[in-house]
Design a protein with these regions (language model features):
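Short, hydrophobic/amphipathic alpha-helical patches that form generic packing surfaces
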Residues: 2-4, 256, 260, 376, ...
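Generic recognition of flexible, low-complexity loop/linker segments
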Residues: 49, 53-60, 209-214, 221, ...
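Active-site/substrate-binding loop(s) of hydrolase catalytic cores
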Residues: 163, 169-203, 288-353, 391
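Short, glycine/acidic-rich beta->alpha junctions
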Residues: 35, 39, 62, 75-80, ...
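Generic beta-strand/beta-sheet core signal
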Residues: 73, 102, 226-227, 375-377
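Catalytic or ion-translocation cores adjacent to nucleophile or general acid/base/metal-coordination motifs
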Residues: 91-115, 119-137, 187-222, 227-312, ...
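Long, compositionally biased intrinsically disordered regions
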Residues: 306-530
Length: 530
């Protein structure tokens, strides 16, 4: 109205008035803000119902847990954690970035290095993976794979050896190809050498794990470090389903290294000398959560002493029960499942295992579709709350972090990476032509660095259509990341003031931050300074 009055006062005729700008954009922006506020309110209302559990923990009346299980902060872990705590109430769970704070790279016998840390970091240390003697078939397979991916030789490969791929394709299509755990996840069972890590480095890495996790001195008799991976076949975007904190690789190797460090006798003595000692009967165990099937594989079982085998068996049974419940929760959202597939727990497990090994399956799982929140708080704040697999969960105890160093690390690393993941799903959903990578059925891998759609065009970026859409409607609800932090407001403000990356995310509204106060009963939206 003000603009119209001004134009009339200037004597300009209506036909030269500028058209209303961005009306549709503003309407969509308002709807986005309303949807984000509704999601944030739903999370806060669920958290507000659990203040008494947190108060009990701070009062120190909670008994020692039967096991302490560390999961990755990945939203898919939320479902399994919730069901594990239901199946085994005496268990205690933590959320931590799936590389467990270890900036490592894995080197194989040929000297090839694979980074196992987030893109924000550069590997500072190396571990050597020793797969043992290679068969002639394995060597030949590696050579053929390199030939197939070479820029120029790939054409010759197709012309001369393309027909040889017919039989393996027919076997895969008929379901007779070997895709068992021993085949798809053989790296989880290779020997790992920590000889390249000097004693002081091992101690430093272990101290970081204990400090950043906020572990008490008496965690459970089993301290289970659970990485995650996804079983998928013929999928150029398999890295999007693996662990982002491990550089798009599986988290099994990082979990194994972390467990070895925490079980090392010299490291234990050094931890005790620094006031970070763990109970003498606490044994660290490595595990992997397969997010496609919700099966949990326990690694290096032979390193667990006989005195703890009973504890391990009980935990394994709880993992099995939790996995069955998690599969049942996810099943209604997976396209293509029949009533027969969902008829009972065993049938559903077989179905999801078969889907993960099916080279023609476009949606073996939904990955992080639906992600919208990031919670930085003690687990007692959210334990028992159904967050629907939409929230990253990072454990944090403000009382154990008086100088704010741990919180600063969380806000500047995992939260930033979480915003990247969230924006990747957001952009691939709202603007798939510009920021997605089209349909998987047309993907052609180019030199192992990206995909083309068919045989022309530029490298496609972002997620495939099948990663965010079920064929009828979007599976991912595009919301910007809502971050909830239970910590003193002054501490949060100080951290934001020191880091431009956080100021950019908050000032430009790529993320929204809420400060949880009064035992989670109240959430105050953080407003950047003008």
């Amino acid at each position: 109205a003000y603009d119209v009055a001004l134009l009339e006062a200037k004597g300009l005729p209506p036909e030269v008035w500028p058209a209303p700008r961005h009306d549709d954009t503003l309407r969509r922006y308002r709807r986005l803000c309303v949807a984000e506020r509704a999601f944030a309110q739903s999370v806060v209302s669920k958290l507000a119902a659990r203040p008494r559990a947190a108060a009990k923990t701070r009062a120190g009346v909670q008994p020692r847990p039967s096991a302490s299980v560390v999961f990755c902060i990945d939203v898919r872990s939320e479902i399994l954690r919730r069901h594990l705590e239901s199946a085994l109430p005496a268990v205690e769970t933590y959320g931590f970035a799936g590389f467990f704070g270890l900036p490592l790279e894995a080197r194989d016998a040929d000297g090839e290095a694979t980074p196992l840390c987030p893109a924000l970091l550069r590997p500072a240390h190396a571990v050597v993976v020793e797969p043992g003697p290679k068969s002639s078939a394995a060597v030949a397979g590696k050579l053929l794979s390199a030939l197939r991916k070479a820029a120029a030789a790939s054409f010759t490969y197709v012309e001369t050896l393309g027909l040889a791929a017919v039989y393996p394709m027919l076997r895969a299509a008929s379901g007779h190809e070997a895709h068992g755990p021993g085949c798809a996840h053989a790296h989880e069972h290779h020997d790992v050498s920590l000889e390249a890590l000097r004693p002081e480095v091992r101690v430093s890495l272990a101290r970081g794990i204990v400090k950043n996790l906020g572990l008490p001195r008496d965690p459970g008799r089993l301290l289970v470090l659970t990485g995650h991976d996804s079983t998928t076949t013929n999928n150029p975007q398999a890295a999007a389903l693996a662990c982002g904190a491990c550089g798009g690789h599986g988290g099994g190797l990082s979990a194994r290294v972390a467990a070895r460090l925490l079980n090392d006798a010299e490291v234990r003595r050094a931890l005790a000398a620094h006031g970070q000692g763990l109970a003498d009967d606490c044994v660290a165990v490595a595990a992997v959560h397969d997010t496609a099937t919700d099966l949990v594989r326990l690694l290096d079982r032979g390193l667990v002493p006989p005195s703890h085998q009973g504890d391990l068996h009980a935990l394994e049974q709880a993992f099995a029960a939790a996995g069955a419940r998690a599969r049942a929760e996810r099943a209604p959202h997976l396209p293509g499942l029949t009533e027969r597939d969902r008829s009972d727990a065993a049938a559903l497990e077989r179905c999801l295992t078969r889907r993960s090994a099916d080279w023609a399956e476009l949606r073996p799982e939904w990955g992080l579709a639906g992600n919208a929140g990031f919670l930085v708080a003690p687990r007692e704040r959210s334990r028992g709350a159904n967050l629907e697999g939409r929230v990253f969960l990072h454990s944090y105890e403000a009382a154990r972090d008086p100088d704010g160093a741990v919180l600063e690390l969380i806000l500047t690393a995992p939260v930033v990476v979480g915003s990247w993941i969230n924006l990747q799903y957001y952009a691939s959903t709202v603007a798939p032509d510009a920021f997605g990578s089209g349909t998987k059925t047309l993907h052609n891998i180019v030199a192992g660095v990206g995909v083309l759609l068919g045989n022309e065009g530029d490298l496609a970026q972002g997620l495939s259509l099948q990663s965010v859409h079920d064929g009828e409607k979007p599976r991912h609800e595009p919301l910007r990341l809502q971050v909830f932090v239970e910590a003193p407001r002054a501490r949060i403000e100080g951290i934001v003031a020191r880091h431009a990356v956080l100021q950019q995310l908050l000032d430009h509204e790529w993320i929204t931050l809420y400060v949880l106060e009064d035992d989670g009963a109240r959430a105050t939206r953080y407003t950047p300074a003008a």
